[in-house]
């Protein structure tokens, strides 16, 4: 009885204060159909494919939006790789790097009618390696993918806040 009463009170509090999940504001700003484009870096073409897939997946799973062609889209998101760096974080007793942090700098541009939002976001991902080992290609790609996902999540959060601010106007 106490559990159901507490749940009922919490439900009333959330409904009466007008609470909306932040994704609702991003959905409203983005629209139903979104065109996505990721600039392919000639030095790292695999990363563009991973980022485009991650962006499309994020739009479909987090915002429940469909990816469409440019002419049918309500809005567009463009992503450009600016910089990819690996920074040593920790060394062992012999001076070998045992922990790295990947810094993936992405430039995002969101366009919808007259609204144009540009944002430079750095996604970071920490990962260990064996002492005296070089960063393997698989580990490198995984770190870039995870760092890109973190940057995408941050950009979606930014769109939610932007949608909230536009909704209040």
Predicted regions and their residues:
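Sec-dependent signal peptide recognition
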Residues: 2-9
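Extracytoplasmic/periplasmic, Sec-exported soluble proteins
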Residues: 43, 47, 51, 98-100, ...
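N-terminal, post-signal-peptide region of Sec/Tat-exported proteins
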Residues: 51-78, 82-84
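Surface-exposed short loop/turn segments
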Residues: 66, 76-142
